[in-house]
């Protein structure tokens, strides 16, 4: 359920967003978003893992069974499954889960499964996962849901599990509708449950529709190779003691 919603034209996004981000995500995955355009793929669905997380895959940081929480179209789950990991992706959007399942079936990845679930209250995976990855979910949930979310993923984590979070920096996106974080805010929330190894500056990538224009000047947006754009964020690495 990751998002690049605040990249969108400032006026349009506030006029057309519903009161619930969950509904906006669902319409985006169905190709029915007013903000992005009819039939347009969500900008955050770039067809591959976020580059910051792809680098961790290459470095061998992902171990054992992997939980992709807020998986969206599940690019990282699918990439890890192709490397032999058993992956489970959870997302609140039924449309996103259906897209992920379809792609897994297309690639013949029986070791990648997906379920509709609320990240702040899911159960049924106690002590299972060696690695948990949050690819831009953290800023997409209400602040009041963070405690339930962190409790849920700790419950699902195996002893010594690793946890990776890619999240927007509040300095790059100072206003809603999402809940970007400062480094201190991220550290304070996560350190209640995990031993933090590192929080470092990162970039979050998106691909905008052809002809898209008018992004807010205040955002730290960079043009990247292959038609992508990026904005500032944080990459957190942590583990269970």
From Swiss-Prot:
PANTHER family: METHYLTRANSFERASE, UBIQUINONE BIOSYNTHESIS O-METHYLTRANSFERASE, MITOCHONDRIAL. It is found in: Cytoplasm. This is 2-heptyl-1-hydroxyquinolin-4(1H)-one methyltransferase. The keyword Methyltransferase applies. GO terms for molecular function: methyltransferase activity. InterPro entries: Methyltransf_25, SAM-dependent_MTases_sf. Belongs to the methyltransferase superfamily. One of its GO terms (cellular component) is cytosol. It comes from Mycobacterium tuberculosis (strain ATCC 25618 / H37Rv). It catalyses: 2-heptyl-1-hydroxy-4(1H)-quinolinone + S-adenosyl-L-methionine = 2-heptyl-1-methoxy-4(1H)-quinolinone + S-adenosyl-L-homocysteine + H(+); 3-bromo-2-heptyl-1-hydroxy-4(1H)-quinolinone + S-adenosyl-L-methionine = 3-bromo-2-heptyl-1-methoxy-4(1H)-quinolinone + S-adenosyl-L-homocysteine + H(+); 3-methyl-1-oxo-2-[3-oxo-3-(pyrrolidin-1-yl)propyl]-1,5-dihydrobenzo[4,5]imidazo[1,2-a]pyridine-4-carbonitrile + S-adenosyl-L-methionine = 3,5-dimethyl-1-oxo-2-[3-oxo-3-(pyrrolidin-1-yl)propyl]-1,5-dihydrobenzo[4,5]imidazo[1,2-a]pyridine-4-carbonitrile + S-adenosyl-L-homocysteine + H(+). The keyword Phosphoprotein does not apply. Induction: Repressed by the transcriptional repressor Rv2887. Induced by salicylate, during iron deprivation (at RNA level), by anaerobiosis and by superoxide generating naphthoquinones such as menadione and plumbagin and by pro-oxidant phenoxyisobutyrates (fibrates) such as gemfibrozil (at protein level). Part of the Rv0560c-Rv0559c operon. Operon induction is slow but is maintained for at least 2 weeks in aerobic culture in the presence of salicylate.
